[in-house]
Amino acid sequence: MPADRIITREQLACMLLPLADPALRWEGYDDEDCGDALRIAVGNGFLAPENRTGPEGHVSGAHAEVHAKGHVSGAHAYDHAPRLMPDGHVTRQEMATVAMQACGVNYRNASSTMPVCADAALVNNNYGTNVARALYFGFMSLEPDGCFKPRRPVTIGEAAGILNRVADFAGI
């Protein structure tokens, strides 16, 4: 699989499986065809069930690639019951949360913060602390222009690199 392709939630879940407790699985209703890896990744808190679709939320990997190239306009967010969305893409701000959940650092009582980057205003509040920490720990980095690009879909190569840095940090 090419490293520059956008990673799907199912593919990322498969990469996370060695770090997960298989007894923890998402038992919510979902009529989508997905593998056990995604249910386990959600059950372990690495990924969250999604309830949005559209360019600002989660869409199929093919649609995300079109969006990343700038061929989609307008915001089309629709509310749905939480779903696993195995073919949905993973944004950089979500990947920051995955990295922090997987690294083994307990920061439950830590204060919240927002990242220091040129586009900090684009980082959703619920992801801000994880983005700041993923940057601090070196799991992720800013673009050359000083932006984090929180809503840009993550590629397979990026996800592998981030998880390798997390594994090195955690001694795995």
Residue ranges of predicted features:
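Feature responds to low-complexity, polar/acidic, surface-exposed segments characteristic
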Residues: 1-96, 100-127, 141-154, 165-172
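Interaction-mediating elements
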Residues: 119, 131-134, 159
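Phosphate/pyrophosphate-binding loop motifs in nucleotide- or prenyl diphosphate-using proteins
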Residues: 138
